[in-house]
C-alpha cells in the first residue's frame, strides 16, 4: 500500500505529461496543460498533497519520504523557475545515489546495517546475509541512478516513460530476486531451528 501511495504523484506526472498541450482558463488565468512543465507542476502539487495527508494521518513521514518530497520540491522548482527540464532529469539519479550513500554509511556508522534496521523486525537472518543484502541494495540504487541518468540524457523521447515504468520494473525485479534469495535462507533457518515438543 505504501509503495502505491508513493507512486501516485509520479503517475499523475506521467498522465499530464502525455496530454496534448492545451490552454485552459483557471480563475481568469490562462494555463498550459500538457508537456513537461505542467507535469512538473502536477508532480509538486500532488507530492505536497499526498505526503501532507500522510503526515497529518501518521504524524510523521519516513526519512525516505522526506527525501523524495524535498528532492521533488527542489528539482521541480528549479525546472519551473529556469524553464529547463535538465534539473528534473537529475532528480532520480540524485535521490537513488543518496539512498545508496545512506546504505553505504550504515557499514561505518551505527550498530546495525540500514537494511537490518528496516527489515530486522520481520526477519531473523545471519549477519553475513544482512551484509550481502545491504550491498545488494547499494548496487541496486547505484545502478538505478546511472540508468536513469543515461536514459534521460540519451533517449529524450522515452525518458519520462522510463522514469515511471522502467524504474518501477527494475524495483519489482529486484524485489522478486531478493525474495527468492531470502526464501532460501529463511528455509535454512527453519530447518536448523530445534523443534520443541508439544
Curated annotation (Swiss-Prot):
Briefly state the protein's biological role. Answer: Plays a role in cell envelope biogenesis, maintenance of cell envelope integrity and membrane homeostasis.
User: Sorted alphabetically, which NCBIfam families does this protein's record hold?
Assistant: ispZ, PRK00259.1-3, PRK00259.1-5
Provide the family line. Answer: Belongs to the YciB family.
Going by the UniProt record, its keywords in alphabetical order are: Cell inner membrane, Cell membrane, Membrane, Transmembrane, Transmembrane helix
**Membrane-crossing segments per the record:** 36-56, 67-87, 90-110, 135-155, 162-182
The record's Gene Ontology cellular component field reads: plasma membrane
The organism's lineage?
Answer: Bacteria, Pseudomonadati, Pseudomonadota, Gammaproteobacteria, Pseudomonadales
Protein's name according to its UniProt entry: Inner membrane-spanning protein YciB
Q: Where can this protein be found?
A: Cell inner membrane
Q: Does the keyword Ribonucleoprotein apply?
A: no
The membrane topology noted for this protein in its Swiss-Prot or TrEMBL record is: Multi-pass membrane protein
Keyword flag Zinc? no
Amino acid at each position: 500500500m505504501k509503495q502505491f501511495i508513493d507512486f501516485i504523484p509520479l503517475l499523475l506526472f506521467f498522465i499530464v505529461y502525455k496530454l496534448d498541450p492545451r490552454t485552459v482558463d483557471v480563475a481568469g488565468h490562462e494555463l498550459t496543460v500538457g508537456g513537461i512543465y505542467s507535469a512538473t507542476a502536477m508532480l509538486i502539487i500532488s507530492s505536497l498533497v499526498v505526503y501532507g495527508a500522510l503526515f497529518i494521518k501518521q504524524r510523521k513521514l519516513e526519512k525516505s519520504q522526506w527525501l523524495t518530497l524535498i528532492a521533488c520540491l527542489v528539482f521541480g522548482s528549479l525546472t519551473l523557475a529556469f524553464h529547463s527540464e535538465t534539473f528534473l532529469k537529475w532528480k532520480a539519479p540524485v535521490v537513488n545515489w543518496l539512498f545508496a550513500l545512506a546504505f553505504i554509511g550504515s557499514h561505518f556508522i551505527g550498530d546495525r546495517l540500514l537494511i537490518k534496521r528496516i527489515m530486522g523486525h520481520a526477519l531473523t537472518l545471519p549477519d553475513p546475509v544482512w551484509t550481502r543484502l545491504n550491498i545488494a541494495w547499494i548496487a541496486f540504487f547505484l545502478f538505478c541512478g546511472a540508468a536513469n541518468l543515461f536514459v534521460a540524457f540519451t533517449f529524450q523521447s522515452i525518458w519520462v516513460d522510463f522514469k515511471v515504468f522502467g524504474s518501477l520494473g527494475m524495483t519489482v525485479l529486484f524485489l522478486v530476486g531478493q525474495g527468492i534469495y531470502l526464501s532460501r535462507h529463511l528455509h535454512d533457518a527453519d530447518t536448523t531451528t530445534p523443534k520443541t515438543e508439544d
